[in-house]
Every structure is written in structure tokens, then in C-alpha cells.
């Protein structure tokens, strides 16, 4: 994460050659990965780099930040982000979550949401805390995006994210409205990727990528 080692020229070439696929820059800010005392500075550097690349290339690169077990508060990280940037793993409970034990949301997190920062649940293997999720949802803080954050080596591995239907079932069990969940796994991600009206919709003329499920009320047994 040493900015002195960033190969910006190579970044430009790769982004230019893959404009249709590269939507942003991602940085992982976890304890043991970045120094405790300067964690937020690394994020500010990446945000500045995204601005510079956008100015030179005419792109609209977002910044996505991995926030699980961050060395600095969730509010400090959220305060660095621009409208449209992504606060990833918003319900992690490993360290410095967005919600305190008394159920209050970090004020800087709320301000970030007001100015358009995107909050992605991105469950993954170790990036979801049930207590943090319950507290945040009870406070009315819903995720903009619900995703799995799956990698090849974690797909179908219980009891974590496993697959998207399992993640959807988690949020149903947590009490979220079904339509709200579906919007967070289809319509909103499509819009953020610049594909609104093409995917994540049943609109006539859209790309047909459809899964049909039966909703069944039953105890989940691993």
C-alpha cells in the first residue's frame, strides 16, 4: 500500500484498454495490512488518484474500500469517500463497525450516506457480523447493495456467504422487505455499473437473465 510503489502509468494503460470492465479502484484497509496511525491516509491517496485518473482519461472511476477490522473508525473512512464511492462490508463486526453497541450509527457514516456514498453489505467469508447487522437494521440503516463478495475458493462453502440465494435468505430472516432485498441485488447494482435497463430488470428488451424461486418458511439447517 506504499503509494511510492503505485505504477500509475501501468494503471492508465490497463484502464484505457478495459474501459468497459474496470469501474473503479479498490483498497483493503484492515489491521495488519495498513499501519494503524495512517489508515485513512491511504484511502485519501487512492481517492485522489481516482480523481487524477478520471481527469486524464475521462473516466468515472469509483473507489471501493474494504472496511473489515479497519485500524480507524468507520466514520473516518466514510468521511474520505466521494458520492458514488463504495463502503464495502458495511455490516462487518470484526472491528470499528458502523454501529455502536448502543445501536447508534456513526454520524460521519450517516453524513456519507446523505451525500451519496454507497454501502455494500458484501457478506464474504468473514465480512459479516450478525450483531452489527441487527443493530444497524434496527436503527433503520439498510444496505444499498446486498452482494456475496464470493471468490472461487469460497463458492458453496457453508456457513458463510455460500451463494446469493443464501445471502438473500439471511436478509429475509433479518426482517428486510422482499422487494427491498431484490432491488439491492438487481436494480441498484445494475445502475451503479451503468447497465440500468439492460440487466437487473424484467423490462421488455432487457437481457434475459432470470432465476425463479419458491419462497419457503422453514428453519435453515446447515
Identify the function of each model-found stretch.
Residues 5, 67-70, 192-195:
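Short gly/ser/thr-rich secondary-structure transition/capping motifs
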Residues 131-213:
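His/Asp/Glu-enriched, well-ordered alpha-helical/loop segment
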Residues 1-29:
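Divalent-metal coordination cores built from histidine and acidic residues
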